[in-house]
Swiss-Prot record:
Keyword RNA-binding carried by entry: no
Keywords, comma-separated and alphabetical: Antibiotic resistance, Disulfide bond, Hydrolase, Plasmid
Organism: Klebsiella pneumoniae
Active-site positions on this chain: 45 (acyl-ester intermediate), 143 (proton acceptor)
Protein name: Beta-lactamase SHV-4
Length: 265
């Protein structure tokens, strides 16, 4: 496949939309590849990783417990809640809700967790506190996936998202235990199959979270590397494309394939 930037340009023309991408070394934070890395893109469900980072920060501070049971009702459920809809009778723990939000992209689980951190404004305040002055959450699931052209609500930039992920996974902002827990939830992602996982060679590490919108957007945040090691952060967002979801998936997989093929560069 072509070099990553060539593949990205190709994807933009095939999608008639915009691609935003960054590839960052996890250890050093050095940027290896960037395309529209400072432009805004809808986060969609990729925000759920940051959300569970905020939850884990509360756990580390002693303000929350992963074992705490949350009870909820039918009227708390929103569209696409494959795990939480099964637990109306018994409720779910905070840890189970994070697992559902990240591994299955369960929207009601995300809303229940969002309430514990003070809603969209509370999550945005957490981002500011860890030094991300760009990423913003304004709405709840499922409205946050609206992805209107030119709308800054519920957006990030590839550069800001990558830096924030790096802070959550490697800095002292979360305990070592919480860092490992956040990464493990991403390793266990069950709904990212058609994206980078579809082009992953044997023996490569991946941990990821995807996002989708009915209105022309798609995204993935991932940790990736050969020798089963999380070597780099890769963030890819698409927006304003008329292409089908299958086509969006294919283009993201193509960009992933180009990155993997030209890893040593």
């Amino acid at each position: 496949s072509p070099q990553p930037l060539e593949q990205i340009k190709l994807s933009e023309s095939q999608l008639s939309g915009r691609v935003g991408m960054i590839e960052m070394d996890l250890a050093s934070g050095r940027t290896l590849t960037a395309w529209r890395a400072d432009e805004r893109f809808p986060m969609m469900s990729t925000f759920k990783v940051v959300l569970c980072g905020a939850v884990l920060a509360r756990v580390d501070a002693g303000d929350e417990q992963l074992e705490r049971k949350i009870h909820y009702r039918q009227q708390d459920l929103v569209d696409y809640s494959p795990v939480s809809e099964k637990h109306l009778a018994d409720g779910m723990t905070v840890g189970e809700l994070c697992a559902a939000a990240i591994t299955m992209s369960d929207n009601s689980a995300a809303n229940l967790l969002l309430a514990t951190v003070g809603g969209p404004a509370g999550l945005t305040a957490f981002l500011r506190q860890i030094g991300d002055n760009v990423t913003r959450l304004d709405r709840w699931e499922t409205e946050l996936n609206e992805a209107l052209p030119g709308d800054a609500r519920d957006t990030t930039t590839p550069a800001s998202m990558a830096a924030t992920l790096r802070k959550l996974l490697t800095s002292q902002r979360l305990s070592a235990r919480s860092q490992l827990q956040l990464l493990q939830w991403m390793v266990d992602d069950r709904v990212a199959g058609p994206l980078i996982r579809s082009v992953l060679p044997a023996g490569w590490f991946i941990a990821d979270k995807t996002g989708a919108s009915k209105r022309g957007a798609r995204g993935i945040v991932a940790l990736l590397g050969p020798n089963n090691k999380a070597e780099r952060i890769v963030v890819i967002y698409l927006r304003d494309t008329p292409a089908s979801m299958a086509e969006r998936n294919q283009q993201i997989a193509g960009i992933g394939a180009a990155l993997i093929e030209h890893w040593q560069r």
